[in-house]
A protein has these predicted regions:
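Beta-sheet-rich non-transmembrane sensory/scaffold domains
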Residues: 1-622
Length: 622
């Protein structure tokens, strides 16, 4: 949704204006004005992209794009992300500890975790990298900030980024009940090789109690250093590298929600790209965190803890099911974020699209299932409103897609669109104009399902998903155009399928792989599928970026397909490892002027926007 939870305009509808007045597309984001990190960024004149383990600067301001500089990051960049603001870039890299051995330095560009975090730290490390873009021919890393933890997600508004990090406690060795189970006592009671469920449960309960006592003692003996994330800051702004290290958060900035939602530490860091990279002015909250959503005013982090009753077939149904806890942070200030409230909804969330703020309230779409029994599945749309430090549920509608799971969701203005699927695809329209009384007002049942929904005009939504049979068998990739101008009667106007039953697209689970260019009514998505050759009995892997023209009257028409050149086969290492080649996967599309650029790990290709004909190829160096 864009603006205030879905008000016009929508992200992607209105082109951005570059410094030279050239229209260009940015990252496909959920909220207008709230940037999301991605593996490629542009301002209409410059393109920053990850590929082959490097950051590449491509000048797109001239008649043809030109590679100006590449920066070796010493890290895998497949899931790397970044923000770009004026002459600074903030890179977000997931890394793992490198232990080269005593007295052996870590590889170039990697942190010696053994030196800084100790030999007992084996979890993930988040690396924030500040890059100076002033001289494209000589890109420079100004500073690195290494944090013990994993990136959950990030957002940026007007050059101020909020980075959400989840850090598990370190140096604490828990004991699971299975480690304390007295198998000798159990076998002495029932006999070797015999099974007795009642006796087993008795001994399991004893082990569970021992585990609780043991782990509580571990917690009681722990120190603050076990709970707070650690950091190493590397300043490369001038002369030899300067290092500092310590705890990322102060105790005064760590909060505890009124509901238990895990033992990890959530850190919300504030990094202003107009200033140098410091320690992030973090605020902490004891909680797990998996899903991040942000409006211009608030950032929400959601987590769905494991419920042990779901694995117990004898548990009371009232004890089963899932609960999602949502934590709210005020980000209106350009300075430190502020934790303000927490709330809960029944069920689990599909993705960030399951949350949307509108007129101060948070709408949440969720699916709940009791234990492993899928016949109990049911979906809900709930509305939470802040009251002090609580987010109270003020309205809810349930009964959506019974026995099914949410596969796609989008809130636009005062309406929610929820797709569930098991056999057919019900597209529900949910009226949330009265937040205290949300109501399902329309339903459309069709084969297949849409995993991603995107507004493409007044009363029109484009869906990207999978086709299917009436029996629920999923087939190839599908693009559908829906008319939702009448909430009570949504209609599928057009659909097209592409590929075969093995078809797949990154756009199914990552909206940033989807491009909508409203100016010409064109959408582009990456697609992959395999074909079986009966003559050779071999499978071939096909892939490319496909462009479609979308029109209410004319339907969905294929404009063309873009493919990248095959890389040169790898040189022979020996007779067993010779000539290995691979097909680059096209992952992103963006528009600048009358060109559409597609990105793979090996390069950028510029094609004509009108017909997707080849124009220019920029290969990334090895």
């Amino acid at each position: 949704s864009g603006g205030d939870g879905g008000g016009d305009p929508q992200p992607g509808d209105a082109p951005n204006d570059g410094n030279g007045g050239v229209d260009y597309s940015g990252t496909n984001v959920q909220e207008l004005g709230v940037d999301e990190p991605d593996l490629v960024k542009t301002d209409g004149e410059r393109i920053l992209a990850f590929g082959r383990g490097k950051l590449h600067f491509v000048d797109a301001s001239g008649a043809s794009p030109a590679l100006r500089g590449s920066l070796d990051l010493g890290a895998d960049t497949w899931d790397a992300q970044m923000f770009m603001h004026e002459d600074r870039a903030l890179l977000l890299l997931r890394t793992w500890p490198t232990y080269a051995g005593d007295g052996v330095p870590a590889p170039a560009g990697q942190l010696d975790a053994q030196k800084w975090f100790g030999q007992d730290y084996w979890s993930s490390i988040l690396r924030l990298v500040e890059v100076d873009l002033t001289d494209p021919d000589n890109l420079k890393v100004v500073s690195n900030l290494y944090i013990t933890g994993d990136l959950v997600s990030a957002r940026m508004i007007d050059g101020v980024s909020r980075v959400v990090v989840r850090s598990a406690p370190s140096g604490l060795v828990w004991k699971d009940p299975s480690e304390l189970f007295d198998y000798a006592a159990y076998e002495a009671e029932v006999g070797v090789g015999n099974w007795d469920e009642v006796v087993y449960q008795k001994h399991w309960d004893i082990a569970l109690q021992k585990s609780k006592v043991y782990n509580k003692a571990i917690i009681d003996a722990s120190k603050v250093e076990n709970w707070l994330p650690r950091y190493v800051h590397e300043d490369l702004s001038g002369g030899p590298a300067k290092y500092s290290t310590g705890m990322l958060l102060d105790c005064e900035t760590v909060m505890h929600a009124g509901v238990y939602s895990g033992l990890s530490m959530l850190s919300v860091l504030t990094v202003d790209l107009n200033a140098s990279l410091g320690l992030g002015k973090g605020v902490g909250l004891f909680s797990e965190g998996e899903t991040v959503y942000a409006s211009k005013d608030n950032l929400y982090v959601a987590t769905t803890p494991w419920n042990p009753a779901n694995a117990d077939p004898n548990a009371n149904p009232e004890q089963q099911g899932r609960t999602t806890y949502v934590h709210k942070f005020d980000i209106k200030s350009r300075d430190q974020a502020k934790y303000v409230a927490s709330g809960a909804v029944r069920g689990a969330l599909l993705s960030q699209w399951a949350m949307s703020e509108y007129q101060g309230d948070l709408r949440v779409a969720s699916t709940d299932t009791l234990g492993w029994d899928s016949s109990t599945s049911e979906s809900f749309v709930s509305v939470l409103r802040q009251d002090g430090d609580d987010m109270m549920q003020i309205g809810q509608v349930g009964g959506l897609g019974k026995t099914e799971q949410i596969q796609g969701v989008r809130f636009i203005g005062d309406t929610g669109y929820v797709v569930t699927f098991r056999q057919t695809d019900p597209l529900y329209t949910v009226d949330v104009s009265d937040p205290t009384k949300p109501a399902v007002v329309g339903e459309l049942k069709i084969p297949g399902f849409s995993a991603y929904l995107h507004p493409v005009g007044e009363g029109l939504i484009l869906g990207v998903g999978r086709d299917g049979t009436l029996e629920g068998q999923v087939t190839g990739m599908q693009i559908s155009l829906f008319d939702v101008s009448d909430k009570a009667s949504p209609k599928q106007l057009h659909k097209t399928t592409i590929g075969n039953d093995w078809g797949w697209s990154e756009a199914l689970f990552d909206h940033k792989a989807f491009l909508w260019w409203a100016k010409t009514g064109m959408t582009m998505i990456p697609l992959e599928w395999s074909n079986y050759d009966e003559q050779t009995s071999e499978y071939t892997w096909e892939q490319g970026a496909f462009g479609f023209h979308v029109d209410k009257e004319d339907g969905i028409q294929l404009v063309g397909e873009i493919q990248h050149p095959q890389p040169e086969p790898a040189p022979c290492v020996d007779e067993w490892e010779c000539g290995y080649s691979w097909t680059p996967v096209l992952r992103r599309s963006l528009v600048i002027g009358d060109l559409v650029y597609t990105l793979s790990d090996i390069g950028l290709k510029a094609s004509a926007l009108a017909d997707l004909g080849d124009k220019h190829w920029v290969e990334f160096p090895q």
